[in-house]
Amino acid sequence: MEFSVESLETPALTKAHLAELLFEQIGLNKRESKDMIDAFFDLISDSLVDGNDVKISGFGNFQIRTKAPRPGRNPRTGEAIPIQARRVVTFHASHKLKDQIQGDSAADIAE
């Protein structure tokens, strides 16, 4: 099943637009569509907060990485400021997604 995002005013795909696509393409009502999208992203967020990786086959992996504390500097004053340790989310695209993106780019370049 193919979904079109060409009707978007901006090139970003939003949660609201995903819910609209579920409504239009699959036939869920608008409330169910919104609830399903919200639940999907809540599951991903909760899993990451708990320290678990999220692996979506054919799309990519979301991982939590702990960054060590390091010295920083205020760019205006030059004052040294310590940057505390923190956890960050990283995303690594799957080979399949990378290939799809490269395939589209190669076709655009060839035209």
UniProtKB/Swiss-Prot annotation:
A Gene Ontology molecular function term for this protein is: DNA binding
- CDD domains under this entry? IHF_A
The family database entries (Pfam families) matched by this protein are listed as:
Bac_DNA_binding
Q: Which keywords, in A-to-Z order, does the entry hold?
A: DNA recombination, DNA-binding, Transcription, Transcription regulation, Translation regulation
**GO CC list:** cytosol
Q: Which SMART domains match?
A: BHL
The role this protein plays is: This protein is one of the two subunits of integration host factor, a specific DNA-binding protein that functions in genetic recombination as well as in transcriptional and translational control.
**The protein's name:** Integration host factor subunit alpha
